[in-house]
A protein has these predicted regions:
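Glycine-rich phosphate/adenosyl-contacting loop at the front of the ribokinase-like
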Residues: 1-44
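Charged C-terminal helix
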Residues: 3-6, 224-266
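Active-site cofactor/substrate anionic-group-binding motifs, chiefly glycine-
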Residues: 37, 41-87, 93
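Glycine/small-residue-rich loop that forms an oxyanion/phosphate-binding "nest" at active or ligand-binding sites
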Residues: 76-122
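Conserved phosphate/ATP/ADP-binding segment of small-molecule kinases
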Residues: 104-178
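Short, small-residue alpha-helix embedded
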Residues: 129, 190-220
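Short, well-structured alpha-helical segments that form the helix of a local strand-helix-strand
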Residues: 151-156, 211-226, 247-248
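Short pre-catalytic strand/loop immediately N-terminal to key active-site residues, enriched for Gly-Thr
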Residues: 182-192
Length: 266
């Protein structure tokens, strides 16, 4: 199935109509931006992370997003994840920092095996570290420019999930199809939280329709918002903080006409 602007628009409209509640266990650095971008898309965020409340909270949502930037909240991720798995909710894992921390990598792999996520989304270095069970960089930024797409497909097939590697080109696979998304802008790598925001947006899209096509549509949607924000930033002579605000703006201002920029292919 090809990813058209009409398909993306249908998903976006459905999100705005249904206002799905997305449970995000994410890090303190990006929690505000993650909540705001979900609101901009028409979804409803809840950022609960106490282990004594997350099971009750996640039971009333459409999707759960577990961000390993919040590794201290691992117990909460595990508890919420088990409930989400039992209820058939979409579960997204963002393996922040697994490329530079063996502890995070081991805990992430355990979580994958225990809660059966719908989707894993990370940068190239994080995805490679998960697949190869080794450190690939120091810190959380991606140093990789290339990735073995066949290895990604095999990993996704083994764990019955959608795997997304975000970078200059986003690679999306469910173990069968492999989609390449070429939307996006270099400024997205210059702000903290663009990856975290992408992951919570996947919560909104996959919580509305759980499919690899929906995941690819989300990647295009986020990338297009980045392109439009970059153009506005350049036009006003703004910097990175201006770009961040325009980025969230463009999510709320998205139209089907703008979605015609979609560059996704198999």
């Amino acid at each position: 199935m090809s990813i058209s602007e009409k398909y993306i628009a249908e998903l976006y409209n459905k999100i705005q109509e249904e206002r799905p509640i997305i449970h995000c266990i994410t890090n303190a650095v990006t929690v505000n931006d993650c909540a705001n971008i979900l609101l901009a898309a028409g979804a409803s965020p809840t950022m609960a992370h106490h282990p004594l409340e997350v099971e009750e909270i996640t039971a009333g949502t459409k999707a759960l997003v577990c961000n390993f930037g919040a590794i201290a909240d691992y117990e909460a991720m595990e508890k919420a994840g088990r409930v989400a798995d039992e209820l058939g909710h979409a579960i997204i894992i963002d393996p922040v920092g697994v490329s530079g921390s063996s502890y995070r990598r081991e805990k992430c792999q355990t979580l994958i095996e225990n809660i059966h996520p719908t989707c894993i989304r990370g940068n190239y270095s994080e995805i490679r570290a998960l697949m190869e069970h080794c450190s690939t960089v120091t810190g959380v930024d991606s140093g990789d420019k290339n990735l073995d797409t066949e290895a990604m497909r095999q990993y996704a097939d083994k764990y019955h999930l959608i795997m997304i590697a975000s970078g200059e080109k986003d690679i999306i696979t469910d173990g069968t199809a492999i989609y390449i998304c070429e939307n996006g802008d270099a400024k997205m790598a210059k702000i903290t939280g663009s990856g975290c925001m992408s992951s919570v947006m996947l919560g909104a899209f996959l919580g509305t329709e759980s499919s690899v096509q929906s995941a690819a549509a989300c990647c295009a949607f986020v990338g297009i918002a980045g392109e439009l924000a970059s153009e506005k930033t350049d036009a006003c002579g703004g910097g990175t903080m201006t770009f961040r605000n325009f980025f969230i703006d463009e999510v709320s201002l998205m139209t089907q006409e703008k979605m015609s920029r979609c560059k996704v292919h198999i």
